[in-house]
């Protein structure tokens, strides 16, 4: 039935990065991981069908890789805890992304898992609705991240040919990442971006996203205003019992 719906079309390949405009300085704000940066760039530029799974605790480099990839043309971001099979299918038909950026894959529901299994292996996307069927042959690269792979179905885990496991940042790495990321994407002066990183590490939760949130709440680019935002976040921070 699936073959009849899709027809006998030849398998597509991901468009080379030259067509997608992969910048040479992508991942510039990520400290280290030069070998991984090179592998990802090669995959995209050469149009290779390869799926990457990034596993590690919150606020590690895996989050930054997804953020950087999400800026690329042709990328479609989704969150495992919020996506559904129907929503993912609609995204493939309506947007036909070349790159799927999937965070929290360890929380993805079963109906979305079924869609992923098919498109990651054969490129087949099939929808049956109101006794009508439509099919699509659509190959893409999947970059997914999660805190653990223990809750992932074995068949989904096996779809990823590149499984990478990340360790938490050190203090120096975290501050350096904040300096690079906030100055590049949030237009914060590098010295102030570094200060935000230090305060986030020492006063809050050591999460790059928290540092980004501080940068977006600034009313003026001063350390005093950073301190104001940090005090605000600390006031309403979760109390650990």
Model regions: which residues?
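Walker A/P-loop
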Residues: 45-78, 93
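AAA+/SF3 P-loop NTPase mechanochemical coupling elements
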Residues: 58, 95-96, 127-145
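Conserved catalytic/switch belt of AAA+ P-loop NTPases
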Residues: 113-135
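Conserved AAA+ ATPase small/helical "lid" subdomain
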Residues: 186-238
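Conserved AAA+ ATPase core "coupling" helix
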Residues: 153-187
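Pre-Walker A (pre-P-loop) alpha-helix and adjacent loop at the N terminus of AAA/AAA+ ATPase modules
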Residues: 15-51
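Conserved AAA+/SF3 P-loop NTPase catalytic/coupling segment centered on the Walker-B
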Residues: 62-68, 97-121, 150-160
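Short glycine-rich substrate-engagement loop in P-loop NTPases that contacts/grips substrate
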Residues: 73-99
């Amino acid at each position: 039935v699936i073959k009849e719906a899709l027809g006998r079309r030849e398998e597509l390949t991901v468009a080379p990065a030259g067509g997608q405009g992969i910048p040479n300085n992508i991942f510039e704000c990520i400290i280290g991981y030069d070998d991984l940066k090179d592998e990802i760039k090669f995959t995209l530029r050469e149009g290779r069908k390869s799926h990457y799974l990034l596993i590690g605790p919150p606020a590690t480099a895996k989050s930054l890789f997804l953020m950087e990839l999400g800026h690329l043309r042709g990328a479609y971001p989704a969150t495992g805890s919020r996506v559904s099979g129907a929503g993912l299918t609609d995204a493939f038909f309506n947007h036909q992304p070349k790159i799927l950026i999937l965070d929290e894959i360890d929380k993805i529901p079963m109906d979305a898992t079924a869609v992923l299994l098919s498109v990651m292996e054969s490129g087949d996307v099939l929808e049956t609705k109101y006794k009508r069927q439509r099919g699509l042959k659509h190959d893409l690269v999947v970059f997914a991240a999660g805190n653990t792979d223990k809750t992932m179905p074995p068949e989904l885990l096996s779809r990823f040919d590149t499984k990478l496991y990340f360790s938490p940042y050190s203090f120096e790495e975290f501050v350096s990442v904040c300096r690079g990321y906030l100055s590049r994407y949030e237009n914060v002066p590098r010295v102030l971006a570094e200060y935000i990183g230090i305060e986030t590490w020492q006063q809050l939760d050591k999460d790059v996203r928290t540092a980004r949130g501080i940068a977006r709440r600034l009313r003026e680019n001063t350390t005093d205003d950073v301190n104001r935002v940090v005090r605000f976040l600390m006031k309403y921070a979760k109390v650990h019992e």
